[in-house]
């Protein structure tokens, strides 16, 4: 067993060796390195064929038409293109957008930018379990609402939103519905023929593909129009100009093919890993799961350890690659905005750790982690006067702290 142990699959996944081998065939002089847009010679035709195959593999993963797949540099760009592109195209109908406070920053910051441009955004509060109350969403919808953007699986707490029902609500009101599926594509079953979703963002590096490549699903029936955010050679049906990165696209296609083939065993594996870790951690006092216990992706376990300071806990667990909050905001010492939105106080939000598992996690690693965490928690709590008071039965909320 190698240290440190990687428990941060929600931040990124290692590229599957089978994916890397496929990518290598499209980079060097002895491979198919041509530009897919070069229509006048064999090098271009070979690259174009590889892109077409990958486009089909991505479409098959989510049961979509390959013509509905637009390549981007990743889910952040897909989110920007979907939200800004739809808002700019449909702004004659209205300027109201609805999203949720626990969305990824790539959605929230994009909405903030649109607010600066004169759009109005409603940020829904989630319930304590991290899920959206659909009645509150319905109440927020107005005649001038043009777009709803809700993620499928939350990157920090792993809860799964009911995008099927939200899609029905949006379609009934003729509102464009965008879903950030960065954390769900390739991990849970997605059927675009059954879902009333207009736009969906997908990332390769969350499902054992390369970084720097993603896709945006853009519905053809009903036809969704976007205003391009990148201008140039008119690639991707004018929606996203730029030379297609054949090797990365091939990698994403292969990652999607493997994800579809191995989804059942991947799900069973991460569920077993999650259950084993939780069984070990749950034997301690004052340990809580954040987010709904049932409606969640099994590869994510977000846990708060009461009476322990989060920074010191992460330092004590230096042999475990875990995170507090998302990778995109983990550099800040602010408590997670997602956990705060759930109603956790600063102390509980600060003492939370996100464990995320994947294809290469082993039971040996889980067992090592359990013992390490138990030891670290015990040591840190022994130093905590609050823990001592709690053990003595003192209600900490009743204490009046002296101001210094």
Curated annotation (Swiss-Prot):
According to the lineage, what is the superkingdom?
Bacteria
Q: Please give the cofactor(s) recorded in the UniProt entry for this protein.
A: pyridoxal 5'-phosphate
Broad enzyme group: transferase
Query: Which InterPro entries does the record cross-reference, listed alphabetically?
Result: Aminotrans_V_dom, Aminotrans_V_PyrdxlP_BS, Cys_deSase_IscS, Cysteine_dSase, PyrdxlP-dep_Trfase, PyrdxlP-dep_Trfase_major, PyrdxlP-dep_Trfase_small
Per UniProt, which keywords does this protein have? 2Fe-2S, Cytoplasm, Iron, Iron-sulfur, Metal-binding, Pyridoxal phosphate, Transferase
Q: Where, by residue number, does [2Fe-2S] cluster bind? A: 328
Query: What subcellular compartments does it reside in?
Result: Cytoplasm
Reactions catalysed, semicolon-separated, are: (sulfur carrier)-H + L-cysteine = (sulfur carrier)-SH + L-alanine
Q: What is its main location?
A: cytoplasm
Q: Per UniProt, where does pyridoxal 5'-phosphate bind?
A: 75-76, 155, 183, 203-205, 243
Q: What is its EC number?
A: 2.8.1.7
At which residues is N6-(pyridoxal phosphate)lysine found? Answer: 206
Q: Which residues form the active site?
A: 328 (cysteine persulfide intermediate)
Query: PANTHER family from the xrefs?
Result: CYSTEINE DESULFURASE, CYSTEINE DESULFURYLASE FAMILY MEMBER
Known role? Master enzyme that delivers sulfur to a number of partners involved in Fe-S cluster assembly, tRNA modification or cofactor biosynthesis. Catalyzes the removal of elemental sulfur atoms from cysteine to produce alanine. Functions as a sulfur delivery protein for Fe-S cluster synthesis onto IscU, an Fe-S scaffold assembly protein, as well as other S acceptor proteins.
User: What family does the database annotate?
Assistant: Belongs to the class-V pyridoxal-phosphate-dependent aminotransferase family. NifS/IscS subfamily.
**What protein name does the entry list?**
Cysteine desulfurase IscS
- What is the species of this protein? Colwellia psychrerythraea (strain 34H / ATCC BAA-681) (Vibrio psychroerythus)
